[in-house]
Structures are given as C-alpha cells and as structure tokens.
Amino acid sequence: MKRTFIMVLDSFGIGASEDAAKFGDQGSDTLGHIAEVCARGEANVGRQGPLTLPNLSRLGLGKAAEESTGTFPQGLDRNADIIGAYAHASELSSGKDTPSGHWEIAGVPVLFDWGYFSDEHNSFPQELLDKLVERANLPGYLGNCHSSGTVILDQLGEEHMKTGKPIFYTSADSVFQIACHEETFGLDRLYELCEIAREELTEGGYNIGRVIARPFLGDKPGNFQRTGNRHDLAVEPPAPTVLKKLVDEKGGEVVSIGKIADIYANVGITKKVKATGIDALFDATLIEMEKAGDNTIVFTNFVDFDSSYGHRRDVAGYAAALELFDRRLPELLKLVKDEDIIIFTADHGCDPTWPGTDHTREHIPVLVYGPKVKPGSLGHRETFADIGQTVASYFGVSPMDYGKSMF
C-alpha cells in the first residue's frame, strides 16, 4: 500500500537562496534567526530559553539548515540520532509567494511573472474598483493600499462596520485581499464579492494569483480578530500537478487539510478537510492518515507559522509554534507504515526578524521519513519540484516536466 503525507510548515525557510539579493532578502534565515533570538533569551514570551526541536532535529532539520547556510542553528541538537533523509531546496519559480511554492512542490514551477499592485497607496486601478462597486452594489470601499492584514483592521474596521464599505488591500504578493466583518457585512456576501473580484481580475488580464477573503469579528480597534473562515480564490496551475496525475492516472485520493485545496484551485483534490490552528490541523491530519488507503496523498498546510507569526514578525510566537509542532510530531510518525513516506517542507521563508512584513526568498527544508527511507543527506536540491518528481516516481505516475527524484 502506497501513501504519501506532505506537511508544509508555511514560511519555514532555512536560509537565503542564491538569488535572494534580487528580492532584497540576502541574509534572511527564518530558522536561524529565530534560533539566535531564542538563544539570547529574547523570545521568552509564552516559552523559555533556546529553541528546542528534538524531533525535527532527528529528522535532519539542523543538518539541512547547516548545509544551507554553513551554520548549525543554535539550540538544536547537533548529536541527534538521524532517522530521516534531509535536504535543502532552492526555488525555481519567479516569485516567493504561496501558490508558486506549493505548485513547485507538486512539480509545476511558476516560470511566468505574476501581476502585482505595486503602488503602496491607491494600489488598484480605478476601472477595477468601479466594476466591483457596480457589480456588487457596494456603497464604496476602504483601503486601496498595501497593508498588514491586522493593522488595517485596527485602522479601518470601525469605519467598515459603520459604512458597509469593504476593505480592499494588497501586499508585495500577487494578491487582492478583501476584509469584511462576518456579522455586519456577512460571510456569504464577502465570498460573493471575492468571486466577482476573481472574475474581474481574470477577465481584465491582471494576472493576479489570489483573491483572499479575510473575514473578521470584533467591535473596536484592539479586539478585531480574523476568523478561520478565510477563503482563497486562486488561478489553476498551468500544468498537471502530481496531485492531479495521481487522481487521473491511478484513481488515487488527495486529501487537502487546511488551505491546500484553495491553493490548487481544487484541481487534483478529492477531499477537503477544514481546520484552523496548529492543533486542529494536526488532529485532522492524524485522522486522515489513519483512514488513508492505497494511492493516497494527505497534504496539510500549517498556515499559522506564516500568517500569525512570520508576517507579524513575532519571533517568540513563531518559536512557540515550532515547539508545539515538534512536541506533537511523534503522533504523526507512529502512523507511518511500511511503504509510506512523510515529507516535511515549506513553501518560502518569512523571517520574523527581517524588515517589513513580507515573505523572504529562502531555501526550504526537505525532510523525508519512512521505514524504507535511508537516513542521510540528500544534498542541495535545485528546485522544490524534486519533491513532486519523487512523489510521481513513488506512485508510478507519468514523470513531471521539472525536478529530479531524490531516490
């Protein structure tokens, strides 16, 4: 029985890529810098002391990071008994965004340039805004700028609730984000507005990767909170991913946990499981791993590392989340059976010590475990697509156009 489990620790980079300078990210290192801050005793909010990741260390995380940067992360166990194969991988795709990283993991790098709304103020074309107001019968809009999603709620949340005007904003990523209050504006109405925005962006040729619904609750600045009802409307991958090939060629199953289905525009997904928060995502993953049959991929995105800690530049929060993940890791590993493989990886970096609030162009860890996987270094992988090619080879589907199998 062949099963693969892919766990994406969203934004968990392990050192700047060779081309990081082109993105202004030379020297970024999500894991390494978190470890440094923890070792200095400067991340003792909700946790204490050096970064402690014994189970990820046994899978080779520290070794992979050392091969990436030349420096072993502070606090991790250099003498851990390595039980998995490990590597660091560079991104071939032109961007450092979520869809590019995930599509490349599944064997389809993004070699075209996404469209972006690069102006920090008055970010969106007036023609687009006018169409959204008209088609969705809106009283107007707020924002129209670059912003952190939490900051803009404190700035405009009250006005949004009073006026019914949705909050439109973007970032350095190829995104059009819409924040609305679940109760005063309505969740279904927000989703409908996002569908309209997706249509207009596609028909207008803007080449924007995602429209993201950002629902929130609360009644005043300081207590506005984004809810777990986020929804991403992505464009479809430009070629068949290994997920789609498994479904089409083998009649296989691909179980999405968290936002995976949204990222792939539901293409190559046979089951969707919604969960919010690291513990809930972990619990859902355990349930689906136990139920998984032959020719199945269970694919989970742990988004909180990125959305709650990376973008918010919260080192202590990121460290605590990593330590929580690590504590629960044995629960996953004990469900891995004879022919199974489980892969722990990331889709980009988001160094919480880095200037700004955006992603960072970094190597990702590739940690592979299974009873038949030989422990040791798999070296430097030139593309995330090596993961997809490895999975394609494992299941015996037609090869991907990019990447080399790691085994």
UniProtKB/Swiss-Prot annotation:
Domain of life where this protein originates: Bacteria
Signal peptide: none
Pathways per UniProt: Carbohydrate degradation; 2-deoxy-D-ribose 1-phosphate degradation; D-glyceraldehyde 3-phosphate and acetaldehyde from 2-deoxy-alpha-D-ribose 1-phosphate: step 1/2
Residues reported in the UniProt entry to bind Mn(2+) 2: 306, 311, 359
SUPFAM superfamilies: Alkaline phosphatase-like, DeoB insert domain-like
GO BP: any one term: 5-phosphoribose 1-diphosphate biosynthetic process
Transmembrane region(s): none
Entry protein name: Phosphopentomutase
Origin species: Serratia proteamaculans (strain 568)
Gene name in the database record: deoB
